[in-house]
UniProtKB/Swiss-Prot annotation:
Main localization of the protein described in the UniProt heading: cytoplasm
Coiled coil: none
Gene this protein is translated from: arcB
Molecular function per GO: amino acid binding; ornithine carbamoyltransferase activity
Protein residues bound to carbamoyl phosphate: S54, T55, R56, T57, Q81, R105, H132, P133, C134, Q135, C261, L262, R289
Protein name: Ornithine carbamoyltransferase
Function noted in UniProt: Reversibly catalyzes the transfer of the carbamoyl group from carbamoyl phosphate (CP) to the N(epsilon) atom of ornithine (ORN) to produce L-citrulline.
Cellular compartment(s): Cytoplasm
PROSITE patterns, sorted: CARBAMOYLTRANSFERASE (PS00097)
Enzyme Commission code(s) on record: 2.1.3.3
Swiss-Prot/TrEMBL GO biological process terms: arginine biosynthetic process via ornithine; arginine catabolic process to ornithine; citrulline biosynthetic process
GO CC annotation terms, alphabetical: cytoplasm
UniProt catalytic activity: carbamoyl phosphate + L-ornithine = L-citrulline + phosphate + H(+)
Length: 311
């Protein structure tokens, strides 16, 4: 039995593979909009394991698998043996014998890496403290829909150097664009934590306005991610000057887009004027989680299909 292909961080795929996935996303989304059934994963089963709560991740994967003709089973660690001390490695061997695909949303990247090492089927990272590849997959596809190729473009990341930031930095290496990161002192990017090969595709700025200057895309996330609630008060003070506002958008490129993975806190990491304004594409971004993940699941289970249809 050959080893399954996993999607645990953005750097797991090549630029050519992303080109294929984005082409399939476009084709699959068109089918969806035209109410044309497409069931390449008929009778296949996706198991979704949640340790972290979610709205968009669960909805997009569960609906996506059903739309592809398969079924999705929801597990959380409170209601399964995973929450009662069963070794991750044992759970992986059992769950992967009863399913065709596994998506895990958890805290530590180590958990998903260990699960994948013992899984007989593909494993997808639905989010960890370190990486959020499915979200950046949707973000980049959304940029492509609105502005074309992201190659050679500039992305400004304003806020916490969290899992989203890490994944944007990996994406820049794979797809050849630049990321300008601005964080408060003490929250800077650590290239090794982000899993980077080098520093050629990103730069750090102490001034968020300078990070946004000329950027083609400005993006951010909440200041306090799940699992860091104890730091919330300190973070509110530290990040006060890192709220994406109209001034930051005004120094970006004239056609710059704004993105946020949601849920958002208006008045904290972004003003209502920006997130609800004409440059914001957050609703397209959220919807595209559904379509890119359908293309991702198709690719992981079936390999390259439909190249002629996608072109």
């Amino acid at each position: 039995m050959s080893s399954p292909r996993h999607y645990l961080q953005f750097s797991d795929f090549t630029a050519a593979e992303y080109d294929h996935v984005f082409q399939r996303t476009r084709w699959i989304k068109e089918k969806f909009k035209q109410y044309e059934p497409y069931h390449p994963l008929f009778d296949r089963t996706l198991v979704m394991i949640f340790e972290k709560a979610s709205t968009r991740t669960r909805l997009s994967f569960e609906a996506g698998m059903q739309q592809l003709g398969g079924s999705a089973i929801y597990l959380n660690t409170r209601d399964s043996q995973l929450g009662r001390g069963e070794p991750v490695e044992d759970a992986a061997q059992v769950i992967s014998r009863m399913s065709d695909l596994v998506m895990i949303r958890t805290f530590e990247q180590d958990i998903i890496e260990r699960f994948a090492a013992y899984s007989r089927v593909p494993v997808i990272n639905g989010l960890t403290n370190e990486y959020h590849p499915c979200q950046i997959l949707a973000d980049i596809y959304t940029f492509i829909e609105h502005r074309g190729s992201i190659k050679g473009k500039t992305v400004a990341w304003v806020g916490d150097s969290n899992n989203m930031c890490n994944t944007w930095l990996q994406a820049a290496e794979v797809l050849d664009f630049k990321v300008r990161v601005s964080t408060p002192p003490g929250y800077e990017v650590e290239p090794t934590d982000a899993g980077l090969r080098g520093t050629a595709h990103f730069a750090q700025f102490s001034d968020p306005l300078e990070a946004c200057r000329g950027a083609d895309l400005v993006t951010t996330d909440v200041w306090t991610s799940m699992g860091f609630e104890a730091e919330n008060e300190a973070r509110m003070k530290a990040f006060a000057d890192w709220c994406v506002d109209a001034e930051m958008m005004s120094v970006a490129a004239p056609d710059a887009l704004f993105m946020h993975c949601l849920p958002a806190h208006r008045g904290e990491e972004v003003t209502a004027e920006v997130i609800d304004g004409p440059q914001s594409v957050v609703w397209d971004e959220a919807e595209n989680r559904l379509h890119v993940q359908k293309a991702l699941m198709e690719y992981l289970v079936l390999g390259r299909v439909g190249d002629e249809e996608s072109n």
